[in-house]
Amino acid sequence: MDNLTHSLVGALIGQAGLKKKTGLAMPALIIGANLPDVDAACFFWLEGTEHLGFRRGITHGPPALILLPLVLAGLLYGFDRWQARRGKRPEGRLPVSFKWLYALALLGCLTHPALDWLNVYGIRLLEPFSSQWFYGDTLFIIDIWLWLLMGFATWFSLRREKRGGDWRKPAHWALTLGALYIAGQGMITGAAERGVTESPTGTAVVIASPPPLMSWKRDIITGGNGLYTMNADTTFPGVPLDRCDLDAVRAADSQVDAFLFWARTPYVVPQEDGSLLLQDARFSDPRAAGRFS
Protein backbone atom coordinates (compact mmCIF):
# COMPACT_ATOMS: atom_id res chain seq x y z
CA MET A 1 0.00 0.00 0.00
CA ASP A 2 1.00 3.64 -0.27
CA ASN A 3 2.77 5.37 2.59
CA LEU A 4 -0.17 7.62 3.47
CA THR A 5 -2.29 4.54 4.19
CA HIS A 6 0.48 3.03 6.30
CA SER A 7 0.87 6.30 8.21
CA LEU A 8 -2.85 6.66 8.88
CA VAL A 9 -3.04 3.12 10.25
CA GLY A 10 -0.18 3.88 12.63
CA ALA A 11 -1.81 7.16 13.67
CA LEU A 12 -5.18 5.52 14.33
CA ILE A 13 -3.62 2.81 16.47
CA GLY A 14 -2.09 5.59 18.54
CA GLN A 15 -5.35 7.53 18.71
CA ALA A 16 -7.11 4.35 19.82
CA GLY A 17 -5.25 4.81 23.10
CA LEU A 18 -1.82 3.26 22.74
CA LYS A 19 -0.10 6.62 22.38
CA LYS A 20 -0.51 7.09 26.13
CA LYS A 21 1.75 4.12 26.91
CA THR A 22 4.99 6.06 26.49
CA GLY A 23 6.43 9.30 25.27
CA LEU A 24 7.18 9.34 21.52
CA ALA A 25 4.59 6.62 20.97
CA MET A 26 3.14 8.28 17.86
CA PRO A 27 6.51 8.50 16.05
CA ALA A 28 7.14 4.85 16.97
CA LEU A 29 3.79 3.80 15.48
CA ILE A 30 3.78 5.99 12.38
CA ILE A 31 7.44 5.57 11.44
CA GLY A 32 7.23 1.89 12.35
CA ALA A 33 4.27 1.46 10.01
CA ASN A 34 6.44 2.74 7.15
CA LEU A 35 9.76 1.25 8.22
CA PRO A 36 9.87 -1.79 5.87
CA ASP A 37 9.83 0.62 2.93
CA VAL A 38 13.41 1.52 3.80
CA ASP A 39 14.11 -0.79 0.85
CA ALA A 40 13.24 2.17 -1.40
CA ALA A 41 16.88 3.15 -0.94
CA CYS A 42 17.64 0.50 -3.57
CA PHE A 43 16.88 3.10 -6.26
CA PHE A 44 20.28 4.61 -5.46
CA TRP A 45 22.17 1.52 -6.67
CA LEU A 46 19.79 -0.49 -8.86
CA GLU A 47 18.88 0.35 -12.44
CA GLY A 48 15.76 0.01 -14.56
CA THR A 49 13.52 -2.82 -13.44
CA GLU A 50 16.04 -4.31 -11.00
CA HIS A 51 14.16 -2.74 -8.08
CA LEU A 52 11.16 -4.99 -8.84
CA GLY A 53 13.15 -8.02 -7.76
CA PHE A 54 14.41 -6.34 -4.59
CA ARG A 55 11.53 -4.41 -3.05
CA ARG A 56 8.92 -5.98 -0.77
CA GLY A 57 11.41 -8.66 0.14
CA ILE A 58 14.19 -8.72 2.72
CA THR A 59 12.94 -5.68 4.67
CA HIS A 60 9.43 -7.18 4.81
CA GLY A 61 10.47 -10.60 6.15
CA PRO A 62 10.53 -11.93 9.73
CA PRO A 63 14.11 -10.96 10.73
CA ALA A 64 13.67 -7.38 9.52
CA LEU A 65 10.29 -7.05 11.21
CA ILE A 66 12.00 -7.85 14.52
CA LEU A 67 15.23 -5.88 14.04
CA LEU A 68 13.97 -2.70 12.33
CA PRO A 69 11.65 -1.79 15.24
CA LEU A 70 14.56 -2.38 17.62
CA VAL A 71 16.65 0.16 15.70
CA LEU A 72 13.78 2.65 15.63
CA ALA A 73 13.10 2.26 19.36
CA GLY A 74 16.79 2.79 20.10
CA LEU A 75 16.89 5.96 17.99
CA LEU A 76 13.76 7.39 19.60
CA TYR A 77 14.98 6.53 23.09
CA GLY A 78 18.34 8.12 22.35
CA PHE A 79 16.62 11.20 20.92
CA ASP A 80 14.64 11.63 24.13
CA ARG A 81 17.78 11.31 26.27
CA TRP A 82 19.64 13.76 23.99
CA GLN A 83 16.86 16.34 24.34
CA ALA A 84 16.85 15.86 28.11
CA ARG A 85 20.61 16.47 28.36
CA ARG A 86 20.26 19.70 26.39
CA GLY A 87 17.31 20.85 28.43
CA LYS A 88 15.09 20.79 25.33
CA ARG A 89 12.80 17.92 26.28
CA PRO A 90 9.13 19.02 26.01
CA GLU A 91 7.54 19.26 29.46
CA GLY A 92 4.31 17.65 28.31
CA ARG A 93 5.95 14.51 26.94
CA LEU A 94 5.23 11.33 28.86
CA PRO A 95 8.14 9.36 30.35
CA VAL A 96 9.76 7.25 27.67
CA SER A 97 9.82 3.47 28.08
CA PHE A 98 12.16 1.57 25.76
CA LYS A 99 10.04 -1.57 26.10
CA TRP A 100 6.89 0.26 25.03
CA LEU A 101 8.73 2.05 22.23
CA TYR A 102 9.86 -1.29 20.87
CA ALA A 103 6.42 -2.88 21.30
CA LEU A 104 4.69 -0.02 19.47
CA ALA A 105 7.32 0.16 16.72
CA LEU A 106 6.94 -3.61 16.29
CA LEU A 107 3.15 -3.32 16.11
CA GLY A 108 3.37 -0.54 13.53
CA CYS A 109 5.92 -2.52 11.55
CA LEU A 110 3.72 -5.63 11.51
CA THR A 111 0.82 -3.69 10.00
CA HIS A 112 3.00 -2.93 6.98
CA PRO A 113 3.31 -6.41 5.42
CA ALA A 114 -0.29 -7.14 6.38
CA LEU A 115 -1.42 -4.20 4.23
CA ASP A 116 1.09 -4.82 1.44
CA TRP A 117 -0.17 -8.39 1.11
CA LEU A 118 -3.64 -7.10 0.25
CA ASN A 119 -2.87 -5.96 -3.31
CA VAL A 120 -1.88 -7.64 -6.57
CA TYR A 121 1.71 -6.36 -6.47
CA GLY A 122 2.67 -9.04 -4.00
CA ILE A 123 5.08 -9.41 -1.10
CA ARG A 124 7.73 -11.94 -0.10
CA LEU A 125 6.61 -12.48 3.47
CA LEU A 126 9.19 -15.13 4.35
CA GLU A 127 12.45 -13.56 3.15
CA PRO A 128 15.22 -14.58 3.58
CA PHE A 129 13.93 -18.10 4.27
CA SER A 130 11.81 -18.26 1.12
CA SER A 131 11.45 -16.03 -1.94
CA GLN A 132 7.85 -17.03 -2.59
CA TRP A 133 5.48 -14.19 -3.49
CA PHE A 134 2.14 -13.86 -1.71
CA TYR A 135 -0.86 -11.95 -3.11
CA GLY A 136 -4.08 -10.86 -1.44
CA ASP A 137 -5.77 -9.34 -4.53
CA THR A 138 -8.07 -7.42 -2.18
CA LEU A 139 -7.25 -3.70 -2.48
CA PHE A 140 -5.75 -1.44 -5.11
CA ILE A 141 -2.34 -0.09 -4.06
CA ILE A 142 -3.99 3.28 -3.32
CA ASP A 143 -7.50 3.03 -1.88
CA ILE A 144 -9.17 6.44 -1.78
CA TRP A 145 -12.01 5.15 0.41
CA LEU A 146 -9.59 4.05 3.12
CA TRP A 147 -7.90 7.43 2.84
CA LEU A 148 -11.19 9.22 3.44
CA LEU A 149 -12.25 6.96 6.31
CA MET A 150 -8.96 6.95 8.16
CA GLY A 151 -8.05 10.55 7.37
CA PHE A 152 -11.36 11.89 8.68
CA ALA A 153 -11.24 9.65 11.76
CA THR A 154 -7.70 10.78 12.61
CA TRP A 155 -8.66 14.44 12.26
CA PHE A 156 -11.86 13.99 14.27
CA SER A 157 -10.06 12.07 17.02
CA LEU A 158 -7.41 14.78 17.35
CA ARG A 159 -10.11 17.45 17.36
CA ARG A 160 -12.00 15.70 20.14
CA GLU A 161 -8.80 15.29 22.12
CA LYS A 162 -8.12 19.03 22.00
CA ARG A 163 -11.66 19.72 23.22
CA GLY A 164 -11.48 17.21 26.05
CA GLY A 165 -13.88 14.68 24.53
CA ASP A 166 -13.66 10.91 24.03
CA TRP A 167 -10.94 10.88 21.38
CA ARG A 168 -10.38 7.13 21.38
CA LYS A 169 -13.81 6.16 20.08
CA PRO A 170 -13.43 7.63 16.53
CA ALA A 171 -10.21 5.65 16.11
CA HIS A 172 -11.87 2.46 17.37
CA TRP A 173 -14.73 2.91 14.91
CA ALA A 174 -12.42 3.69 12.00
CA LEU A 175 -10.23 0.66 12.61
CA THR A 176 -13.31 -1.56 12.91
CA LEU A 177 -14.96 -0.16 9.77
CA GLY A 178 -11.66 -0.37 7.90
CA ALA A 179 -11.31 -4.05 8.81
CA LEU A 180 -14.91 -4.74 7.72
CA TYR A 181 -14.32 -2.87 4.45
CA ILE A 182 -11.21 -4.94 3.74
CA ALA A 183 -13.06 -8.16 4.56
CA GLY A 184 -15.84 -7.12 2.17
CA GLN A 185 -13.31 -6.42 -0.55
CA GLY A 186 -11.87 -9.88 -0.03
CA MET A 187 -15.32 -11.38 -0.50
CA ILE A 188 -15.79 -9.43 -3.75
CA THR A 189 -12.47 -10.77 -5.04
CA GLY A 190 -13.34 -14.34 -4.08
CA ALA A 191 -16.74 -14.16 -5.76
CA ALA A 192 -15.23 -12.66 -8.92
CA GLU A 193 -12.59 -15.39 -9.18
CA ARG A 194 -15.10 -18.16 -8.58
CA GLY A 195 -17.31 -16.72 -11.32
CA VAL A 196 -14.70 -17.35 -14.03
CA THR A 197 -15.47 -20.54 -15.97
CA GLU A 198 -13.78 -19.97 -19.32
CA SER A 199 -11.47 -17.59 -21.17
CA PRO A 200 -9.99 -17.29 -24.69
CA THR A 201 -6.54 -17.87 -23.19
CA GLY A 202 -7.54 -20.47 -20.61
CA THR A 203 -7.95 -20.29 -16.87
CA ALA A 204 -4.66 -21.66 -15.56
CA VAL A 205 -4.23 -18.24 -13.93
CA VAL A 206 -7.22 -16.26 -12.64
CA ILE A 207 -6.68 -12.90 -10.93
CA ALA A 208 -9.44 -10.54 -9.81
CA SER A 209 -7.57 -7.24 -9.71
CA PRO A 210 -9.16 -4.29 -7.86
CA PRO A 211 -9.14 -1.13 -10.02
CA PRO A 212 -8.55 2.36 -8.63
CA LEU A 213 -11.58 4.21 -7.22
CA MET A 214 -14.20 1.62 -8.23
CA SER A 215 -13.40 -0.82 -5.45
CA TRP A 216 -16.64 -2.75 -5.98
CA LYS A 217 -15.46 -3.89 -9.43
CA ARG A 218 -12.70 -6.28 -10.49
CA ASP A 219 -10.54 -6.53 -13.61
CA ILE A 220 -10.38 -10.24 -14.38
CA ILE A 221 -7.05 -11.47 -15.75
CA THR A 222 -7.04 -15.01 -17.12
CA GLY A 223 -4.61 -17.13 -19.07
CA GLY A 224 -1.14 -18.54 -18.60
CA ASN A 225 2.17 -19.28 -20.33
CA GLY A 226 2.52 -15.71 -21.65
CA LEU A 227 -0.99 -15.46 -23.12
CA TYR A 228 -3.50 -13.41 -21.12
CA THR A 229 -6.95 -11.89 -21.42
CA MET A 230 -8.42 -8.97 -19.49
CA ASN A 231 -12.15 -9.02 -18.70
CA ALA A 232 -12.81 -11.69 -21.37
CA ASP A 233 -12.72 -9.11 -24.18
CA THR A 234 -9.11 -7.87 -24.38
CA THR A 235 -6.42 -10.39 -25.28
CA PHE A 236 -2.88 -9.10 -24.95
CA PRO A 237 -0.29 -9.73 -27.67
CA GLY A 238 2.17 -12.43 -26.79
CA VAL A 239 3.84 -15.72 -27.59
CA PRO A 240 3.88 -18.89 -25.49
CA LEU A 241 6.69 -18.45 -23.00
CA ASP A 242 7.67 -22.10 -23.23
CA ARG A 243 8.87 -21.33 -26.76
CA CYS A 244 11.27 -18.68 -25.47
CA ASP A 245 14.73 -19.32 -24.07
CA LEU A 246 14.12 -17.18 -21.01
CA ASP A 247 16.87 -18.81 -18.98
CA ALA A 248 19.51 -17.57 -21.42
CA VAL A 249 18.05 -14.06 -21.46
CA ARG A 250 17.88 -13.94 -17.67
CA ALA A 251 21.49 -15.03 -17.39
CA ALA A 252 22.55 -12.28 -19.80
CA ASP A 253 20.44 -9.39 -18.47
CA SER A 254 19.96 -8.62 -14.77
CA GLN A 255 16.94 -6.42 -15.51
CA VAL A 256 15.13 -9.23 -17.32
CA ASP A 257 16.02 -11.58 -14.48
CA ALA A 258 14.62 -9.16 -11.88
CA PHE A 259 11.47 -8.55 -13.91
CA LEU A 260 10.69 -12.24 -14.38
CA PHE A 261 11.41 -12.93 -10.72
CA TRP A 262 8.77 -10.33 -9.82
CA ALA A 263 6.29 -10.89 -12.66
CA ARG A 264 3.15 -12.89 -12.00
CA THR A 265 1.60 -12.72 -15.46
CA PRO A 266 4.49 -11.95 -17.84
CA TYR A 267 3.97 -11.70 -21.57
CA VAL A 268 6.09 -10.68 -24.56
CA VAL A 269 5.09 -7.74 -26.76
CA PRO A 270 6.75 -7.63 -30.22
CA GLN A 271 7.83 -4.09 -31.13
CA GLU A 272 7.88 -2.45 -34.58
CA ASP A 273 11.69 -2.39 -34.59
CA GLY A 274 11.81 -6.15 -34.08
CA SER A 275 12.69 -6.02 -30.39
CA LEU A 276 10.65 -7.73 -27.69
CA LEU A 277 9.20 -6.01 -24.63
CA LEU A 278 8.32 -7.87 -21.44
CA GLN A 279 5.21 -6.70 -19.61
CA ASP A 280 2.97 -7.94 -16.81
CA ALA A 281 -0.78 -8.21 -17.39
CA ARG A 282 -1.46 -6.86 -13.89
CA PHE A 283 0.00 -3.51 -14.94
CA SER A 284 -0.97 -3.38 -18.61
CA ASP A 285 -2.72 -0.01 -18.32
CA PRO A 286 -0.75 2.50 -20.47
CA ARG A 287 -0.45 4.80 -17.45
CA ALA A 288 1.44 2.13 -15.51
CA ALA A 289 2.95 -0.20 -18.11
CA GLY A 290 6.04 1.95 -18.66
CA ARG A 291 7.07 1.56 -15.02
CA PHE A 292 6.61 -2.22 -15.09
CA SER A 293 8.18 -3.33 -18.38
Language-model region placement:
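Extracytosolic and intramembrane catalytic regions of membrane-associated proteins
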Residues: 202-205, 210-293
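N-terminal membrane-targeting hydrophobic helices
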Residues: 1-210
